[in-house]
Amino acid sequence: MFAPLLKKLFGSKNEREVKRMLKTVNIVNAFEEKMVALSDEQLRAKTAEFKERLAKGETLDQLLPEAFAVAREAGKRVMGMRHFDVQLIGGMTLHEGMIAEMRTGEGKTLVGTLAVYLNALSGKGVHVVTVNDYLARRDANWMRPLYEFLGLSVGIVSAFQPPEEKRAAYASDITYGTNNEFGFDYLRDNMAFSLEEKFQRELNFAVIDEVDSILIDEARTPLIISGQAEDSSKLYIEINRLIPRLTQHIEEVEGQVTQEGHFTIDEKSRQVELNEAGHQFIEEMLTQSGLLAEGESLYSSHNLGLLTHVYAGLRAHKLFHRNVEYIVQDGQVLLIDEHTGRTMPGRRLSEGLHQAIEAKENLNIQAESQTLASTTFQNYFRLYTKLSGMTGTADTEAFEFQSIYGLNVMVIPPNKPLARKDFNDLVYLTADEKYAAIIADIKESMTQGRPVLVGTATIETSEHMSNLLKQEGIEHKVLNAKYHEKEAEIIAQAGAPGALTIATNMAGRGTDILLGGNWEAEVAALENPSPEQIAQIKADWQKRHQQVIESGGLHVIASERHESRRIDNQLRGRSGRQGDPGSSRFYLSLEDSLMRIFASDRVKNFMKALGMQSGEAIEHRMVTNAIEKAQRKVEGRNFDIRKQLLEYDDVANEQRKVIYHMRNSLLAAENIGDTIAEFRQEVLDATINQHIPPQSLPEQWDVAGLEASLASDFAIKLPIQQWLDEDDHLYEETLREKLLKEITDAYNEKEDQAGIDALRTFEKQILLRVLDDLWKDHLSTMDHLRHGIHLRGYAQKNPKQEYKRESFTLFQELLESIKRDTIRVLSHVQVRREDPVEEEARLRREAEELASRMQFQHAPAPGLESEQLSEEGAEVAVAVAPVRNDQKLGRNEPCWCGSGKKFKHCHGQIE
């Protein structure tokens, strides 16, 4: 009630922050005259001076005014660009670990240099994160002269980079790269077998460009490093033949069935579900095709994998459409980012869905994969000591940035007031009427000599729009995922007089559309242009620039609303940069996805009440409000999904931190002999407790089982029963001491044979391999648990609490298995001395082989049998090799090794 009054009296929080920072801006400006008087050498020497002052105890905050003044003066001398006062506020916002929302064309890249320079002085490294390789290279090479003038080094990380080059890039003061590459390198570092193999230093400070795209849009897709699994292509092909025989079950809103069928589709949640008739029908078809045994249920535990394949096939056919969610290019299914319209090479959908789409499109089906390491952007970026970001659209997601990442959003005032006109939406009854109105608007704008940008949500819509324009004989350029390699060229001239560009949501994000076209791109296209040619090109551009401004600037037309207001705002933001004139208009129809699913009833009733006729449009603030309300509803649902994903991944993340800390400590340790000795005692105690329960009577002891377990775990045969028969003074405690001594003595003999140094090195290698293999299997188990945990809700249990409880139990079992399996392997192997050169060559071969099998994805992967611990050329010879029958052992059956334990408690743990 009093909030508007208080806001009027004291200003909003954002306004108060701007006022606070303006005081610092005045101090920076006061340094300007002094900086102008310095020579280049004196200005460059300021960097060394700042580092020295930091070492003596000054803070970055204390250095900020003078450091910003130095960076501003260097920008003038090197780049010919002086930071505006509002850009100084943007730099302070980034330094304070906040998100700076700045409109298109306000110079975000230049703003970043202020905070990056200041924080690079600490010597701990700064990461500048972009959405793609093109922007990373462009920005790094653009700003490199400025940083190098100030005595700072700049590196760029990219995929398929030689390791030495990548390490040098991370060792630089400032490192540019994509969010994917930073995340994957973090995972690779935690798979390294030595400290020298690691790439990243401590995660100190990151500036994320297009922060909303990375921390919001990408948050739902985990980063996965995976290895290939077994081939199931025949199964996908068989399932693909069956799916078209299923029909959709359709009910009207009142519950009246209009079409009997086998499955239902929920467009809001993008889910497809088999009904009872569908289950029976699919079981019959699977039985007939020989995929399901006679009388078997699809819901039997051993058939759940088959059920997953059926659902993958259903989703591939009914929810994923070519040229909307994916395209087919060079025999591969390339996913399309719904937020940017760009293809995502290398990304694959999880749970067999990608393979099901390949089967649907009659392509070569690639093998499934198993997760080797994974994380999410949410958890990766929260590892940085300080995080900040820049974007043109963040305020609509301010609550999520604050609640998930602890980042406040600061709206930076524009250097020049916005002159763009944003017209109300026009809503039509049908899509055909909408497209006719769009073409009429295009013709009118082009007649005026204005450039026009038409934004579409999908490739399908952009190509439909292109076909309509061809029929009208209107010249245009198309920019979508199919033609992304021409993106920079098309966007460069999208602001030329009368230019017409059709673009999916990507709309050349990160590249400004300059009114009149881009004269620098014209110069770059010439070979060795003369000064006269450059001057002529610039003069011609100036005329075109003025012509476009006088005609009204860039006109943005949107063919539909996106689910997110932020994406709509990004499209609008292509026009009206730096105070330029411009306009935007959204054209909608009741047949659009968003309107049909979320907003149609209210708007449809309103249109009926007005008695609208075909071809007429409604333009009313109430309609625009109804649509924005629908968008807020979708945004809220998507936020809940991201938050839920984070809550589940937080459980895995705590475990990930423990395992990675254990791994890093192991890599840093020179001698892990004491750790192995502790493992040995703990494993022995657990083994004894299993067969000789504490404080039990001798009659309850399972001596034969204990002898078998010791032979299995420690590769030692001890006559325990004979000892007990011969020595009346041998009771539980003294027996423990005797067993520990025998096992330790046996291991010490191995140490004498191999040499202490060789065995210590070998212990570290084995522990690393066991830890990695079991962690890999644990990730797969956690995936399966996560995907089925929602069913606990039917038993009146809280799925989240159940997941936490069961994952904790699984993690405890993992830690015990790491100890037991490490001791088992070390006890069974025979170690020989190896030539250091041979050893180094072997380790390099193994690392290269592992790297060649890796895939880098953004989707969880199903399980795979663990790789053998010993490889050809390794220095191990396993004394006991598993001998298996053709029939697979059940998890509760006695283990094949003769230990007397159940398979799941013995070799089943590592297989």
UniProtKB/Swiss-Prot annotation:
Topology class, membrane: Peripheral membrane protein
Cofactor binding note from Swiss-Prot or TrEMBL: May bind 1 zinc ion per subunit.
Region listing for Disordered, in residue ranges: 561-583
Keywords: ATP-binding, Cell inner membrane, Cell membrane, Cytoplasm, Membrane, Metal-binding, Nucleotide-binding, Protein transport, Translocase, Translocation, Transport, Zinc
Single GO cellular component term: cytosol
Source organism: Pseudomonas putida (strain W619)
InterPro entries: Helicase_ATP-bd, Helicase_C-like, P-loop_NTPase, SEC_C_motif, SecA, SecA_DEAD, SecA_motor_DEAD, SecA_preprotein_X-link_dom
Keyword Transport: yes
Family membership: Belongs to the SecA family.
Cofactor(s) it depends on: Zn(2+)
Reaction equation(s) it catalyzes: ATP + H2O + cellular proteinSide 1 = ADP + phosphate + cellular proteinSide 2
Molecular function GO labels: ATP binding; metal ion binding; protein-exporting ATPase activity
A GO biological-process term: protein targeting
Disulfide bond is among the record's keywords: no
Stated role: Part of the Sec protein translocase complex. Interacts with the SecYEG preprotein conducting channel. Has a central role in coupling the hydrolysis of ATP to the transfer of proteins into and across the cell membrane, serving both as a receptor for the preprotein-SecB complex and as an ATP-driven molecular motor driving the stepwise translocation of polypeptide chains across the membrane.
Subunit structure and binding partners: Monomer and homodimer. Part of the essential Sec protein translocation apparatus which comprises SecA, SecYEG and auxiliary proteins SecDF-YajC and YidC.
Protein name, UniProt field: Protein translocase subunit SecA
Annotated positions binding Zn(2+): C895, C897, C906, H907
